[in-house]
Design a protein with these regions (language model features):
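Bacterial N-terminal signal peptides
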Residues: 3-14
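Predominantly soluble domains enriched in secretory-pathway, periplasmic, or organellar proteins
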Residues: 15-321
Length: 321
């Protein structure tokens, strides 16, 4: 009897979908795509989703309303980071394989410009207020670029390769995960990009989100699988809990005060944003560790890489209520 109870309990602990929290709306095929899938960007006007297909050396362009793969941008070298800049209708793609940042016209997908930063060009962020692009790359750099020309206008030096980072609109700071040194760097853009850091306590801190309302920072770790909430003022650890394994993305749903942790073990953890209490754990697919939550579309996109017997896809989830 006890064994049967434990089997039922395990089955209930990771549910495939839930009308109360996230509803699976569609599975959009990425037919022909192979290998690892990295980050995404969304254009809310054209309703196009851009997916960095790292293992396929391409970017997939998806029509979200029609649930279809529209086209691919090919001949890339391990695309990792991706960003959309609405004022210029530009799409930016970073290359882990060649260390480049490429700019495309998002209307016809012509390559407009390219700059080589060095090795392993990775995460990219857009600062609309300052009209700047920030790109993590190499063994410890964040390049500052002009969106129109891709001219290099600054370079922030760190002690190791940067992973996910976030720009604070309230205080002009940049918060950067540095897994190799188990730390989080803070860059003060108002003080000539002065860099400080604090000990993050655990290792493998890849995903990050920022909560401007509560002035807190959320970092997710792989070693061990854990999420921590820090004060963005001084790095003080406020709370930490266990989470799903092999996380590569975390998103704040400000409307519902929730967090979505996307994990390669094949799960999404839905947490309360302040207490970090788990609301639910949903099953996805092994290796599906990257995604994008768009507040404009109010949709959560999860990248599912191809596996034996199945093709790559983007799963589209609708939060509720």
């Amino acid at each position: 009897m006890r064994a049967a109870f434990l089997v039922v309990l395990a089955a209930l602990s990771t549910s495939p979908a839930s009308a109360a929290n996230l509803e699976l709306q569609a599975k959009i095929s990425l037919a022909g795509g192979r290998g690892r899938i990295d980050h995404m960007a969304f254009d809310p006007v054209s309703r196009r989703l851009f997916v960095a297909e790292l293992g396929n050396d391409s970017v997939a362009v998806i029509d979200v309303d029609d649930h279809r793969l529209e086209r691919r941008i090919a001949d890339l070298r391990e695309p990792q980071g991706i960003a959309y800049y609405a004022p210029l209708q530009r799409l930016y793609v970073t290359g882990g394989g060649d260390g480049t940042v490429r700019a495309y016209d998002a209307r016809d997908y012509r390559e407009l410009k390219r700059i080589k930063l060095g090795s392993d060009a990775d995460n990219i962020r857009v600062d609309l207020r300052a009209q700047r692009l920030y790109v993590g790359y190499g063994d410890g750099g964040v390049a500052i670029l002009q969106p129109d020309s891709l001219d290099l206008v600054g370079d922030i030096r760190l002690n190791a390769h940067p992973e996910s980072f976030q720009l604070s609109a309230s205080d002009g700071r940049i918060y950067i995960n540095i897994p190799e040194s188990h730390s989080i760097a803070i860059v003060d853009t108002a003080a000539d990009n002065r860099v400080s850091s604090f000990d993050a306590k655990w290792g493998g801190n890849f995903p990050m989100a920022i909560d401007e309302v509560s002035q807190t920072l959320l970092a997710v770790f792989r070693k061990p699988p854990r999420i921590a909430r820090y004060s963005s003022k001084d790095g003080h650890l406020l709370r930490d809990v266990e989470t799903c394994a092999d996380a590569d993305d975390v998103f704040l749903d400000a409307k519902r005060r929730r967090l979505y942790v996307v994990c390669g073990q094949g799960a999404i953890d839905i947490l309360e944003s302040v207490t970090l209490k788990r609301i639910e754990r949903l099953a996805t697919s092994p290796g599906a560790r990257t995604g994008l939550y768009s507040s404009e579309a109010d949709l959560l996109f999860i990248a599912v890489p191809a596996r034996t017997g199945g093709e790559a896809a983007v799963w589209v989830w609708s939060p509720a209520p």
